[in-house]
């Protein structure tokens, strides 16, 4: 747990990048996989990552980001795309927990019922939750 505290307390915001640095696809994939381990409401992972790392894509993103140099200079920029309606994926996402015996049918049904009660018909709330996650 000390490593977690050290990482959180030692983090900094980076604004200057070496524009000649290139990340491998394996490094980009590992970063994305680590991001996917972060907690979300009902573990729905109601967002997707888009890795922007080609010169052409970085140039388009930089133009859309008010020409911030860091967007063009970074080896990769991850765009986080929120997913409205992510709670509808919950039965598929948590079925392995049911099948593995980690939760029983009542807990499975309860989670789905709670998620549907929280999110159904509440587009603004779903959008806000995707941004928060």
Regions found by a protein language model. Give the residues of each.
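Acidic, surface-exposed loops and disordered segments
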Residues: 1-133
């Amino acid at each position: 747990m000390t490593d977690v505290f050290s990482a959180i307390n030692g983090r900094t915001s980076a604004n200057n990048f070496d524009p000649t640095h290139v990340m491998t696809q394996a490094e980009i994939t590992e970063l994305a996989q680590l991001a996917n381990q972060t907690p979300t409401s009902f573990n729905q992972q109601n967002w997707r990552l888009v890795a922007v790392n080609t010169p052409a894509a970085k140039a388009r993103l930089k133009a859309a980001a008010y020409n911030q140099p860091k967007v063009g200079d970074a080896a990769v920029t991850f765009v986080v795309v929120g997913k409205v309606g992510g709670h509808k994926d919950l039965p598929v996402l948590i079925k392995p927990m049911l099948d593995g015996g980690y939760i029983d049918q009542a807990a499975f049904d309860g989670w789905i019922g709670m998620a549907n009660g929280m999110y159904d018909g509440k587009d603004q709330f779903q959008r806000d939750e995707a941004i928060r996650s």
